Amino acid sequence: MKETVGNKIVLIGAGDVGVAYAYALINQGMADHLAIIDIDEKKLEGNVMDLNHGVVWADSRTRVTKGTYADCEDAAMVVICAGAAQKPGETRLQLVDKNVKIMKSIVGDVMDSGFDGIFLVASNPVDILTYAVWKFSGLEWNRVIGSGTVLDSARFRYMLGELYEVAPSSVHAYIIGEHGDTELPVLSSATIAGVSLSRMLDKDPELEGRLEKIFEDTRDAAYHIIDAKGSTSYGIGMGLARITRAILQNQDVAVPVSALLHGEYGEEDIYIGTPAVVNRRGIRRVVELEITDHEMERFKHSANTLREIQKQFF
């Protein structure tokens, strides 16, 4: 597997998510050069100025510039946050069709530059669009990664931490499957400060109802945030920064992302949310969790939901 070099990142799409990612990236000092591409040139110019002025106070020497696709040639990563939002009355398939076409155009321009790094995709529906980027790019599957369930898992860990009054970093639990309505929590392998959640359930049958409510709040959080402020941005921006750090610092850590399956969970030829070990080469390996029969049934439903959409386009 090829290992990328340097710490230059090209960000495509400077909407709420893209700018939140850029802000997190600068504050964590991960990129030497962040080149940003967006169709709204005037707004992009303002964001680049604003971000550069903040670099003074960050533990960072990141240089932020208005980018072009030529910047992709020597980039270690291209991060895609661009895409169309769903309009009133527009079906999900219509939205997917529109965004698949956008991905085809973006990826074509990126690959024409001679890019040979790692794609990180955040545009929704992320699992389908990550598959599209992989197909259009012609790169090895391990070098095309989607944000997947990184945000869903973070939300779940945060809410479990609130329930048990422990830091989210002491909660180890994953949301897997589609980044969307068919995702599922893996309660069977979850731990709170080292204590198995399954063991807690055995001792307290009423806990099951509270956990189901936490999962529903996790799954539906985006709807509430969008209703309140128009979009989600900070959580996913920080999640993308976490994946970026795992890649650029060659960390070999397991992160919940959208990855191509090759027989894991009995599935293949589909990008879907699952833990994967990530390093400078992209995805080193997909982690297949040991899940219960009920969890497997829900995962299969999630995979089939994605496949039904995917086959309309590929």
Swiss-Prot record:
<keyword id="KW-0560">Oxidoreductase</keyword>
<feature type="binding site">
    <location>
        <begin position="124"/>
        <end position="127"/>
    </location>
    <ligand>
        <name>substrate</name>
    </ligand>
</feature>
<dbReference type="InterPro" id="IPR022383">
    <property type="entry name" value="Lactate/malate_DH_C"/>
</dbReference>
<feature type="active site" description="Proton acceptor">
    <location>
        <position position="179"/>
    </location>
</feature>
<feature type="binding site">
    <location>
        <position position="92"/>
    </location>
    <ligand>
        <name>substrate</name>
    </ligand>
</feature>
<dbReference type="InterPro" id="IPR036291">
    <property type="entry name" value="NAD(P)-bd_dom_sf"/>
</dbReference>
<keyword id="KW-0597">Phosphoprotein</keyword>
<dbReference type="InterPro" id="IPR001236">
    <property type="entry name" value="Lactate/malate_DH_N"/>
</dbReference>
<feature type="binding site">
    <location>
        <position position="172"/>
    </location>
    <ligand>
        <name>beta-D-fructose 1,6-bisphosphate</name>
    </ligand>
</feature>
<dbReference type="GO" id="GO:0005737">
    <property type="term" value="C:cytoplasm"/>
</dbReference>
<feature type="binding site">
    <location>
        <position position="17"/>
    </location>
    <ligand>
        <name>NAD(+)</name>
    </ligand>
</feature>
<feature type="binding site">
    <location>
        <position position="105"/>
    </location>
    <ligand>
        <name>NAD(+)</name>
    </ligand>
</feature>
<feature type="binding site">
    <location>
        <begin position="122"/>
        <end position="124"/>
    </location>
    <ligand>
        <name>NAD(+)</name>
    </ligand>
</feature>
<feature type="binding site">
    <location>
        <begin position="152"/>
        <end position="155"/>
    </location>
    <ligand>
        <name>substrate</name>
    </ligand>
</feature>
<dbReference type="InterPro" id="IPR015955">
    <property type="entry name" value="Lactate_DH/Glyco_Ohase_4_C"/>
</dbReference>
<dbReference type="InterPro" id="IPR001557">
    <property type="entry name" value="L-lactate/malate_DH"/>
</dbReference>
<feature type="binding site">
    <location>
        <position position="157"/>
    </location>
    <ligand>
        <name>beta-D-fructose 1,6-bisphosphate</name>
    </ligand>
</feature>
<feature type="binding site">
    <location>
        <position position="43"/>
    </location>
    <ligand>
        <name>NAD(+)</name>
    </ligand>
</feature>
<dbReference type="Pfam" id="PF00056">
    <property type="entry name" value="Ldh_1_N"/>
</dbReference>
<dbReference type="Pfam" id="PF02866">
    <property type="entry name" value="Ldh_1_C"/>
</dbReference>
<dbReference type="GO" id="GO:0004459">
    <property type="term" value="F:L-lactate dehydrogenase activity"/>
</dbReference>
<dbReference type="GO" id="GO:0006096">
    <property type="term" value="P:glycolytic process"/>
</dbReference>
<keyword id="KW-0520">NAD</keyword>
<feature type="binding site">
    <location>
        <position position="232"/>
    </location>
    <ligand>
        <name>substrate</name>
    </ligand>
</feature>
<keyword id="KW-0963">Cytoplasm</keyword>
<feature type="binding site">
    <location>
        <position position="86"/>
    </location>
    <ligand>
        <name>substrate</name>
    </ligand>
</feature>
<protein>
    <recommendedName>
        <fullName>L-lactate dehydrogenase</fullName>
        <ecNumber>1.1.1.27</ecNumber>
    </recommendedName>
</protein>
<dbReference type="InterPro" id="IPR018177">
    <property type="entry name" value="L-lactate_DH_AS"/>
</dbReference>
<keyword id="KW-0021">Allosteric enzyme</keyword>
<feature type="binding site">
    <location>
        <begin position="83"/>
        <end position="84"/>
    </location>
    <ligand>
        <name>NAD(+)</name>
    </ligand>
</feature>
<comment type="subunit">
    <text>Homotetramer.</text>
</comment>
<comment type="function">
    <text>Catalyzes the conversion of lactate to pyruvate.</text>
</comment>
<feature type="modified residue" description="Phosphotyrosine">
    <location>
        <position position="223"/>
    </location>
</feature>
<feature type="binding site">
    <location>
        <position position="69"/>
    </location>
    <ligand>
        <name>NAD(+)</name>
    </ligand>
</feature>
<dbReference type="InterPro" id="IPR011304">
    <property type="entry name" value="L-lactate_DH"/>
</dbReference>
<feature type="binding site">
    <location>
        <position position="38"/>
    </location>
    <ligand>
        <name>NAD(+)</name>
    </ligand>
</feature>
<comment type="pathway">
    <text>Fermentation; pyruvate fermentation to lactate; (S)-lactate from pyruvate: step 1/1.</text>
</comment>
<dbReference type="GO" id="GO:0006089">
    <property type="term" value="P:lactate metabolic process"/>
</dbReference>
<feature type="binding site">
    <location>
        <position position="147"/>
    </location>
    <ligand>
        <name>NAD(+)</name>
    </ligand>
</feature>
<comment type="similarity">
    <text>Belongs to the LDH/MDH superfamily. LDH family.</text>
</comment>
